[in-house]
Amino acid sequence: MSQKHRILLLNGPNLNLLGKREPGIYGSKTLDEIVADLTHNADELGVTLEHLQSNAEHELVGRIHQAMGQVDFIIINPAAFTHTSVAIRDALLGVAIPFIEVHLSNVHAREPFRHHSYLSDVAKGVICGLGADGYQFALTAAVHQLRAA
């Protein structure tokens, strides 16, 4: 039997407040609920899902580094770090693990400073504006790409 593919889910700053923080923009589901649903679907798809949420850029960078040789795909919602973090971009490029960038809200329909991403041009894909479903779509796409490789 072949080894299960491993997918790393990373969530950036303030996503620990999902369900409480601006539900009109980010929805009413908590991050724990989103991760539980995603973990269940990952199990059904026959892949392993690991998760880290951090409000600290260096913790996300460190986990990306640890993923090298251990993880097959990354799904990342960098949150506010989308618009500021060259460090996360460089870490993702450095480990050369394919990734999909996810945003709950449509960042292009919001304030102008949210329109730029340091990650989008090096991501396999970007999903935004579809709420918590965006994570499910990213998981399905990641599994599809891993199986096609």
Curated annotation (Swiss-Prot):
The keyword DNA damage does not apply. One of its GO terms (biological process) is amino acid biosynthetic process. Pfam families: DHquinase_II. Pathway: Metabolic intermediate biosynthesis; chorismate biosynthesis; chorismate from D-erythrose 4-phosphate and phosphoenolpyruvate: step 3/7. Substrate binds at residues 77, 83, 90, 104-105, 114. InterPro entries: DHquinase_II (IPR001874), DHquinase_II_CS (IPR018509), DHquinase_II_sf (IPR036441). One of its GO terms (molecular function) is 3-dehydroquinate dehydratase activity. It catalyses: 3-dehydroquinate = 3-dehydroshikimate + H2O. The record marks 21 as: Transition state stabilizer. Keywords: Amino-acid biosynthesis, Aromatic amino acid biosynthesis, Lyase. Its EC number is 4.2.1.10. The active site is at 26 (proton acceptor), 103 (proton donor). It comes from the Bacteria. The keyword Lyase applies. Belongs to the type-II 3-dehydroquinase family. PANTHER family: CATABOLIC 3-DEHYDROQUINASE (PTHR21272:SF3). Catalyzes a trans-dehydration via an enolate intermediate. Homododecamer. This is 3-dehydroquinate dehydratase. It comes from Aeromonas hydrophila subsp. hydrophila (strain ATCC 7966 / DSM 30187 / BCRC 13018 / CCUG 14551 / JCM 1027 / KCTC 2358 / NCIMB 9240 / NCTC 8049). The lineage of its organism: Bacteria, Pseudomonadati, Pseudomonadota, Gammaproteobacteria, Aeromonadales.
